[in-house]
């Protein structure tokens, strides 16, 4: 029995270590097993974003503007003074900086349920402590870019109750014979923003510009509870390579691996629960770039060439900008593969069906907490035959534990004879000491997947359960669920045979305390899942053990 228990604890410990190490590497931190080489802060702005040299004049003309923070360069100040234009819709409050017509602040608005504060979250921001921007401009000459001050076109800045769309337009100064009119279109109930760039050639010669669309962000986490970390950083999606995550650490070391040109897909910045993504028109060729532009500032973007524009003519480049929560069903309807920004890691193949099932149950019961309870119950029912096999093996081992202890005491000075005697006992009683391991091991990927489902699902944010639980994404405010978790673990240890080794027995008694401390900081939805799982496991074990005990008693009586 102690061998099987040791194997299970080793499996559990290694799973926990590997999950933690995977989280470390996903956030650009050093791996415990693979030391990082010395990081560099070089990110040449003379490159074209995919590692090619910008030595030629054409490449220099297409080099991205080098203002690292999104503010104006520290050189000659422009004649016009930039200002922030505030706007509001039913889902956004935000600010557009007239310097570049940049989307400099974007707050996703959502009201609370009266028992907690509003659930609004600021996605884009530009402060001394945090930078996250969406910006565009022109390349290919001395054309308007995100450093130039635009003029706001007169018009409403709030979505009226009787309107479905709000348009905000900004005009650039004339540079290189080109004027740009940038228009943001906000739609009621939508987290997709239309961004139209109208390029007017007001000069005397044809121009061939390129439009760049980029997301600029620092590497700081925002609104990330303890032990609730998921991927943070840029991502690229194309039909060729599908979803490619890029860690800030890989960018630091110039090891970022991604598709550098395509005519489909999107680029994104991903964080816990929320994401932003530029989605150019499908079929339009574009170059993709990911760069470090400051010690803590990064950008991911696309450069889309525009056909030659004759004097007096204009060209329009349309794109969509998603900025919102990582709700799978909504993301699936916006762009192919966009739902992948909701990151389940290496268990995606199992996690996605589990979330689908959780979502269906929620649609039936209308409460995410009860949906977690019912899904856990359903999973335990599916795995009942495997659990029964494990508990039966444990029960049989419990029956022969006194005889095992006697053999250990008898042959304690001769380990070889002791092992031979134990093997003979197992053979005589037809007991496999590892018989309970395999059923448990098979279930581990499912339980890890459900962990990631609950961790990554923005639906848990602000979702109440009962009584004191008003937000399943936050820790239990009164620590009731962690205490119940500790109690359930303690009961489980009592149901199992006491290990013959006193040190191991003390460890088994200590584990509930150690794990309960860790669970004090877990989101309530995760702890609820573990509590329900433990309670159901206790009920299963008690039922199976009692059934076997009754059968054994009848056999002896006969």
Swiss-Prot record:
The keyword Ribosomal protein does not apply. It is found in: Cell inner membrane. One of its GO terms (cellular component) is plasma membrane. Keywords: Cell inner membrane, Cell membrane, Chaperone, Membrane, Protein transport, Transmembrane, Transmembrane helix, Transport. It comes from the Bacteria. It is a multi-pass membrane protein. One of its GO terms (biological process) is protein insertion into membrane. It holds the Pfam family YidC_periplas. The chain crosses the membrane at residues 3-23, 364-384, 438-458, 477-497, 508-528. One of its GO terms (molecular function) is membrane insertase activity. CDD domains: 5TM_YidC_Alb3 (cd20070), EcYidC-like_peri (cd19961). Required for the insertion and/or proper folding and/or complex formation of integral membrane proteins into the membrane. Involved in integration of membrane proteins that insert both dependently and independently of the Sec translocase complex, as well as at least some lipoproteins. Aids folding of multispanning membrane proteins. Belongs to the OXA1/ALB3/YidC family. Type 1 subfamily. Interacts with the Sec translocase complex via SecD. Specifically interacts with transmembrane segments of nascent integral membrane proteins during membrane integration. HAMAP family: YidC_type1 (MF_01810). This is Membrane protein insertase YidC.
